[in-house]
Structure formats: structure tokens, C-alpha cells
A protein has these predicted regions:
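N-proximal low-complexity "stem/linker" segments adjacent to membrane-targeting elements
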Residues: 1-28
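Acidic helix N-cap motif at the loop->helix transition within catalytic regions
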Residues: 21, 46-54, 99
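A conserved acidic beta->alpha catalytic loop
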Residues: 26, 33, 41-50, 94
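Short beta-strand/loop segment that forms part of the nucleotide-sugar
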Residues: 35-43, 64-67
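Glycine-rich, basic loop-to-helix element that forms the pyrophosphate-binding segment
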Residues: 66-82
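Short aromatic/hydrophobic "clamp" motif used to bind/position activated sugar donors
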Residues: 87
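Conserved donor NDP-sugar-binding/catalytic core segment of glycosyltransferases
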Residues: 99-132
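Short, flexible, basic/aromatic active-site loop/helix in glycosyltransferases
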Residues: 119, 135-149
């Protein structure tokens, strides 16, 4: 029998309420739903809190306001507030694939020595000449295959 692990999703955000809606909506579509979602608002002046609370009927969601600015501090705040056996992190401008959490959980179930997993990133909202466009054209296939040239 497989061990049941709890999964918390940590989301750090700052003044991107509109993008946060898409990220949180993607968590509602997970084939393996999150046990909790911890959203750390890193000092937003927009309607971030309202967006988070609007998902409380679909997700077990916790809003945490963190006035000390900075991604590392905000991530640590999310980790301190998470209760899951596994803590998955997603940025506020990301949309998770429907199987994202299911795929994250599998290695932890198969091997109790696993500590960290990662996955592929698919970019959207990419503008011509952007860093993301360069990465997609030149780097992403190398990372996925381990190719060096």
C-alpha cells in the first residue's frame, strides 16, 4: 500500500493579482489536488488578498502577509506556514500543468530518500527579444537532455 503524503503548494506574490488568478486557477484543476495552498503576499498594494480569498471555496488556501520584502524571505515564510510532507513551489506568473502535483508526488512515494524534485517549464507570455525567448530557443532542450553543446 502506498503511503499517503500531504502536499502544500507555496506561492509568493507581489502586486501581480491578475496573474495570480491564473496560477491559483491552475491549482484547482490538479488531478492530485493540493492539501493546502499557502500564498505569501510580499507587500502588495493591489487586490492580491481579495484574489486569494476568492479561491477559498475551491482550495484549502492560507493568505499570509509578509511585509519584509524579498523572495528568499517570503519563501521561508511560506515554508514556515506550510504543513505538508511535500512543499511544492510555484511562482505567481506560472500556470501548472494539470498533472503537476501528481508527478511531483510520485518520486517521494517511490523512494523515501528523495528530498527534492524538479520538472520542465513551459513559457508563455513571451515577448520577442525577451530573455525567455532566448532561453526557449537556446537552452531549454539542453537542460532537458543534459546536452552540453
Amino acid at each position: 500500500m502506498e503511503k499517503k503524503l500531504s502536499v502544500s503548494v507555496a506561492v509568493i506574490t507581489f502586486n501581480r493579482a491578475e496573474w495570480l488568478k491564473d496560477a491559483l486557477a491552475s491549482l484547482t484543476r490538479q488531478t492530485r489536488p493540493p492539501d493546502e495552498v499557502v500564498v505569501v503576499d510580499n507587500g502588495s498594494k493591489d487586490h492580491t488578498k481579495d484574489v486569494v480569498l476568492s479561491f477559498s471555496d475551491r482550495l484549502n488556501i492560507k493568505y499570509v502577509y509578509e511585509p519584509v520584502r524579498g523572495i528568499p524571505h517570503a519563501r521561508n515564510t511560506a515554508i514556515k506556514n506550510a504543513t505538508g510532507d511535500i512543499i511544492a513551489s510555484i511562482d505567481d506568473d506560472c500556470v501548472a500543468d494539470d498533472n503537476w502535483l501528481k508527478q511531483i508526488e510520485i518520486p517521494f512515494i517511490k523512494d523515501p530518500h528523495i528530498g527534492v524534485v524538479g520538472g520542465n517549464v513551459t513559457y508563455f507570455r513571451v515577448g520577442e527579444g525577451s530573455v525567455e525567448e532566448f532561453y526557449i530557443k537556446n537552452m531549454s532542450s539542453r537542460l532537458e537532455t543534459g546536452k552540453r553543446e
